[in-house]
């Protein structure tokens, strides 16, 4: 009996390991590692930017540069939003594309990220006086959460563009720590956040290397948060202008609700929610994100394509008006 049980257990374990290995290959992400700065440098036409914490690249404008600087961030994948930086640079803007964790001298994971690293960014911009003002900060997903937190603390920021934003601060993403940690700190103090609940089904899917939709996790996190008011990002403190984008089928978190709430609390923020779009907009989402996108990101192929085209048009209309020659 015992040998038969042992054989059955071994068979099940091997089957699980085999399925997980297949899923790792089947759902592997496309393209370069977003955290690899060498991959950005190899594309050329960039200059490294570095400080004590600040890491990233400067993208000098093509052609006659518009006044000011656009600072861009990506999200929890750890990139510097290279594609968006190049797209904006090609339209005549000086752009700084920055990492905010995962690089040498930075937090290894998206937790305890010191917001005051933006002091270094402002100092770098000031040294390049021809591109000093205005300053627009653009962020995507957790990078949008970062951008909103910077905007309410730094009056030097004139404009913000938030893709798939959050209206609240959420727990940091550090899977090597059992204890909950904040995403951000300010002057060495943690920024209040809503903790993420534990769902066994999510753990199983992660173990099996299957894509996960986290929207329910974030919705439950906010609904159950005893410190909801403290975790709220007080966007009404931001006195500049802003543009907010979301898809109504975002599978990562409730960015559509966040766009509504943020734009209601600050009337200088223009919110746009695209039907049929998910967490990230793309003209070819299959090619760009592979097989993970329907579950993790949401939306439809056509909806995400339309959102990318329409949001790009509106983005450059607003950037052109914010960064006008005087």
Feature-to-residue mapping (PLM):
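Short beta-strand element of the alpha/beta-hydrolase
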Residues: 66-75
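Short alpha-helix in the alpha/beta-hydrolase fold that links the catalytic acid
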Residues: 85, 253-265, 286
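Alpha/beta-hydrolase fold nucleophile elbow
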Residues: 129-141
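Short beta-strand/loop motif that positions the catalytic acidic residue
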Residues: 238, 244-246
């Amino acid at each position: 009996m015992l040998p038969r049980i042992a054989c059955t257990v071994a068979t099940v374990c091997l089957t699980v390991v085999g399925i997980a290995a297949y899923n790792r290959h089947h759902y592997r992400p496309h393209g370069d590692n977003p955290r690899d700065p060498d991959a950005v440098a190899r594309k050329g036409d960039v200059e490294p930017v570095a400080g004590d914490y600040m890491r990233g690249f400067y993208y000098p404008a093509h052609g006659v540069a518009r006044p000011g600087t656009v600072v861009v961030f990506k999200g929890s994948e750890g990139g510097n939003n290279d594609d968006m930086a190049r797209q904006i640079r090609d339209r005549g803007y000086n752009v700084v594309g920055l990492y905010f964790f995962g690089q040498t001298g930075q937090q290894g994971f998206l937790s305890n990220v010191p917001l005051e690293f933006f002091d270094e960014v402002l100092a770098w911009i000031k040294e390049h006086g021809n591109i000093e003002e205005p300053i627009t900060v653009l962020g995507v997903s957790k990078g949008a959460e970062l951008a909103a937190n910077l905007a309410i603390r730094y009056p030097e920021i004139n404009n913000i563009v938030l893709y798939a934003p959050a209206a609240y601060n959420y727990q940091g993403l550090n899977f090597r720590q059992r204890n909950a940690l904040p995403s951000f700190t300010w002057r060495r103090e943690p920024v209040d956040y809503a903790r993420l609940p534990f769902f066994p089904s999510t753990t199983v899917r992660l173990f099996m290397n299957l894509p996960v939709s986290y929207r329910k996790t974030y919705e439950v996190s906010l609904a159950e948060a005893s410190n909801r008011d403290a975790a709220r990002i007080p966007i009404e403190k931001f006195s500049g202008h802003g543009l907010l984008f979301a898809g109504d089928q975002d599978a990562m978190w409730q960015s559509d609700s966040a766009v509504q709430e943020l734009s209601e609390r600050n009337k200088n923020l223009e919110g746009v929610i695209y039907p049929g779009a998910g967490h990230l907009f793309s003209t070819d989402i299959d090619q760009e994100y592979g097989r993970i996108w329907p579950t993790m990101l949401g939306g439809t192929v056509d909806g995400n394509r339309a959102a990318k085209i329409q949001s790009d048009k509106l983005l450059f209309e607003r950037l052109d008006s914010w960064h006008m020659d005087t």
